[in-house]
Curated annotation (Swiss-Prot):
Protein name as catalogued: Protein phosphatase 1 regulatory subunit 12A
Source organism: Mus musculus (Mouse)
UniProt region (Disordered), positions on chain: 290-786, 808-927
Gene name tied to this protein: Ppp1r12a
Motif (KVKF motif): 35-38
Compositional bias (Basic residues): 681-691, 840-851
Amino acid sequence: MKMADAKQKRNEQLKRWIGSETDLEPPVVKRQKTKVKFDDGAVFLAACSSGDTDEVLKLLHRGADINYANVDGLTALHQACIDDNVDMVKFLVENGANINQPDNEGWIPLHAAASCGYLDIAEFLIGQGAHVGAVNSEGDTPLDIAEEEAMEELLQNEVNRQGVDIEAARKEEERVMLRDARQWLNSGHISDVRHAKSGGTALHVAAAKGYTEVLKLLIQAGYDVNIKDYDGWTPLHAAAHWGKEEACRILVDNLCDMETVNKVGQTAFDVADEDILGYLEELQKKQTLLHSEKRDKKSPLIESTANMENNQPQKAFKNKETLIIEPEKNASRIESLEHEKADEEEEGKKDESSCSSEEDEEDDSESEAETDKTKPMASVSNAHTSSTQAAPAAVTAPTLSSNQGTPTSPVKKFPISTTKISPKEEERKDESPASWRLGLRKTGSYGALAEISASKEAQKEKDTAGVMRSASSPRLSSSLDNKEKEKDNKGTRLAYVTPTIPRRLASTSDIEEKENRESSSLRTSSSYTRRKWEDDLKKNSSINEGSTYHRSCSFGRRQDDLISCSVPSTTSTPTVTSAAGLQRSLPSSTSTAAKTPPGSSSAGTQSSTSNRLWAEDSTEKEKDSAPTAVTIPVAPTVVNAAAPSTTTLTTTTAGTVSEVRERRRSYLTPVRDEESESQRKARSRQARQSRRSTQGVTLTDLQEAEKTIGRSRSTRTREQENEEKEKEEKEKQDKEKQEEKKESEASREDEYKQKYSRTYDETYTRYRPVSTSSSSAPSSSSLSTLGSTLYASSQLNRPNSLVGITSAYSRGLAKENEREGEKKEEEKEGEDKSQPKSIRERRRPREKRRSTGVSFWTQDSDENEQERQSDTEDGSSKRETQTDSVSRYDSSSTSSSDRYDSLLGRSASYSYLEDRKPYSSRLEKDDSTDFKKLYEQILAENEKLKAQLHDTNMELTDLKLQLEKATQRQERFADRSQLEMEKRERRALERRISEMEEELKMLPDLKADNQRLKDENGALIRVISKLSK
């Protein structure tokens, strides 16, 4: 039964078999001849390796390449040197093998022989002309990698005999690349050839080997920073892989793509050396910031005006250079640039002012010889571009001295990628403006400024959309390392310690710029008012033709320009106003007057400020209703009292004035930096050196006074001020009585006071306006006294930056009486212990820092003041003195302006000094016994402080002793643990030595096995090659 079932299954299998693919196969198996065909080069290398010279000769006769290299770049000669096969080395060299052919790592056969220590092969190779100065990829010569002394001696002797400069040999490749890069840059054509195997470019090589100079030149010549080799590696991959930090930084600064992947999906971070991974991450953050900053920047890098005619021509940089323009704009601009060159060279002869040029980083090594070769160069203008197009940045590039043309040689253009800006320009755009912007500040005369026209101003306002900076104003911009913050701080601190006058047009523009950035609503109005102001100036062209000062928009760009532009100027002489207005505009007038060429008149310069001065004056007039408007011939530094009939200016409405005053006050509150002790000492020393014997008020006093005045004025009403004026008169009478008593009782105290307070009292009584009872004519007459006394004093050259800051704080001379009342009231309240806490807190730090002596009121000062007032009513004599001073203005414009500025600042802030006096000054209203009490208090405080100091010293010594004990304990523990560590290490090393000795015994057996396997391998290869024929 089972047999039947088996047969049935078998039959079914046979049925399924019939017609299957296997059944359809032919019965005779096809015999295909299988051949293993090796590359001729591989066969040749195998034959050489086996030492079969006959086989090698046959292969050479059949056309084999004797210099064939395997995947690692090793040739038969390399292999023979490694195998110590002297016969094969001689055979190959005799048959024409290249004795200096490098492998993939740059090793020539001599490197291999030196590394292995085969003296006979090395001697033979040197005898046949091998290069002992050959350098591999890591910069090593055969001498560097030789390990045996005999080999080192052989190679050293040969180096000495041939006179090879090893250091020069190491830098040979970089020198050649540098030469080629310069050549490409000068010719405007990059003729680079990719590596045959890897597809690497010169940029890859420079990045991988850290040739930073070559890298910069290649990028400048227009190389794509994201170019890839055959494996998809960019230059950043190469630089990161070989750990070249500087090369990575240059590539990132030129906005290379840090996320690019190679053929196997690796970014530069994946292939980077571990040591620079953190640095790469920092660079990535930096590049992200650069990208975001670039997106935010809508304005051009160099903001040019309508046709650059109202500015000096841009000068050449210090190196031999060419101008690189954005490629997509080249065609449309080259002609215009050529035309402009001739015009601006002529203009450059008239205008001797020059731009201080910034040297590019990459040109530092070559720039020393060319520092004196700055000549006019083509400047890029906005006039030939649409309003939405950014003016191109001028990018500099060094040239070889052998290929040097004139600096105004035709502009080269480079074939770069279609729509990209050249990478160097990208780098320049993203650099912080603080460094290169310095090159845009004017440092000399400004004669060329007079050539501007109203139509060009209109075009300029259109192009810059109301926020326009002239080339002479610094630009404060946020950068990666907080340069804005440093700049702002620097601009503020200049007021304290600046020793010299900065040579630039608007010295206060740094501070003004900071304020302007905070008020965007004022910017748009400034562009309109400035254009209108320029049109008004054109009407006065008979005066202004000589040297009109066109104020940059960053200087004084405030709402009060609205007033100045709405007042038509019809005077033939510049008009000045109240002290506040004059003080406000002095920085511009003094800086321009100082820089006017000797032959030109300063009248036009000063008249350009008259509108702003009148605006300030009208502000003060509306506030005080006192006739303080006066005239000044030629210079805005001397005030002619009580002569409003000679002015021809019209005032603006009171509504606009008050609105402007409120707006200005809101953002002019001074911010004081915290000072260290050393800074304070330096500032005090500078102040002492630069002031006269009668100058008692420093810049710090002015700043503190303005703070207090601003706060008190905002909180007090008119009614309170009137009450305080009455109180002030009563207090004066009381004080005079007290002082008379004190004079008889305490003569020694009076002498002390007179000795230390004269510097303050003389200045104050000489320049202070009279009290409110005679606030109209006498106030003007005291101003004339100020003007006449001003020029008799010695010259005081304060820096313009100090003047600019002082001007903002001393605007309230016309309301001196009100402020006196306020200060007296505050003193009284302070003595009753009812004054606000904030005022007391403000006093304390000031008292600690006072270094200019003690200020007192005396009976003599008040009597002198009355005598002064009676003297100043004689107007004719003072006016004579004034005209005398005016004639002197031409020769001392800068110093007199500064002097007037400082005197106004002191008189305006004197009342604040009353509030700031130390205890001894305020106690003179009390009995003389208070001095004894004060002395006892100070004595007790000193004793207390001494006791505290003693306790602190004791604690300090205890702590030092504890620290020494702890240190010694730690040292003992460290020594013990170190001994144990050394013992463990020694045991481990001994075990290791014994293991090595065992392995050393097995070494001969391994060598024998290795040789046998080599022989078998060679035999197999020969058999296979014969079979394949």
